[in-house]
From Swiss-Prot:
Keyword Cell membrane: yes
Species, as recorded: Xenopus laevis
Similarity annotation: Belongs to the DRAM/TMEM150 family.
Extracellular topological domain residue ranges: 23-50, 105-115, 172-183
Residues bearing attached sugar chains per UniProt: 29, 33
Pfam families on file: Frag1 (PF10277)
Name of the protein described by the UniProt record: Modulator of macroautophagy TMEM150B-B
Annotated Gene Ontology cellular component terms: autophagosome membrane; endosome membrane; plasma membrane
Topology within the bilayer: Multi-pass membrane protein
InterPro entries, A to Z: DRAM/TMEM150_Autophagy_Mod, Frag1/DRAM/Sfk1
Keyword NAD: no
Length: 231
């Protein structure tokens, strides 16, 4: 059903719009002073009232991300691709969503170490997730999106990786504003990568979740009679 394509689009629109609204709130109420430099995403969402909105935006986004990851996992299985990579990809997708929720609920001003752990899961593991999805895009058949979706995912994943490295380097050089800009771009790329699943989900007609019982091995009559005689 084509309506499934709306799910990743909703995540992209919700998350992108949500964090920019949080940024606007933090600037308008003076929680963030732009004369001190461009803020990190988490700095914008540290103080109330925008911290409440920030947490809600990321919690809903995390829920949608888990939903998308599970559907994508099953879709790939339905294409008879039973690669271990698909299972590992599901696990990393769920970890990415968990990290996103942690970032929203543990502000850096209150629980810095927990917040940083969540950021690692959201950004680093999230990037790994989309590298795996890029590989799976080339492995499965049919290939939705023609010959374009694979290269697009590949280029966006490269850009995401490069910007994460740049973010760490600029932070080490104490160029926090530039590092923060890199973080914002990484977040936008990750949201866009989630949105690209709309191309795959458009073709979800005929895909079903199956719950199968384990087959019970029943001995044949010869085996039963042999056992009986031996007794």
């Amino acid at each position: 059903m084509w309506a499934w394509a709306l799910l990743p689009i909703c995540l992209t629109v919700w998350a992108t719009g949500g964090i920019w609204i949080v940024y606007a709130m933090s600037v308008s109420n003076g929680s963030v002073n732009l004369s001190d430099g461009f803020p990190y995403i988490s700095v914008s969402g540290t103080y109330p009232p925008q911290s409440c909105v920030f947490g809600q935006v990321l919690n809903v986004g995390a829920m949608l991300a888990v939903w998308i990851s599970v559907i994508r996992f099953q879709q790939i299985r339905d294409y008879n691709c039973h690669s271990v990579l698909n299972s590992v990809s599901l696990a990393t997708g769920i970890l990415c969503a968990l990290g996103t929720s942690i970032v929203g609920n543990f502000q850096q001003s209150n629980q810095l170490q927990t917040h940083l752990a969540g950021a690692f899961l959201a950004f680093i593991i999230g990037n790994v997730y989309f590298w795996m999805q890029t590989a799976l895009t080339y492995m499965v058949k049919p290939k939705h999106g023609g010959c374009y979706i694979g290269p697009i995912r590949f280029c966006l994943s490269i850009a995401c990786t490069a910007l994460i490295v740049a973010m760490a380097v600029f932070l080490k050089m104490n160029m926090k504003s530039v590092s923060a800009i890199c973080e914002w771009i990484v977040a936008m790329i990750l949201f866009l990568l989630y949105g690209l699943f709309a191309v795959d989900f458009w073709h979800l007609d005929g895909h079903f979740f199956h719950v199968k019982k384990r087959r019970t091995v029943i001995p044949n009559e010869m085996e039963v009679s042999t056992v009986t005689l031996s007794i």
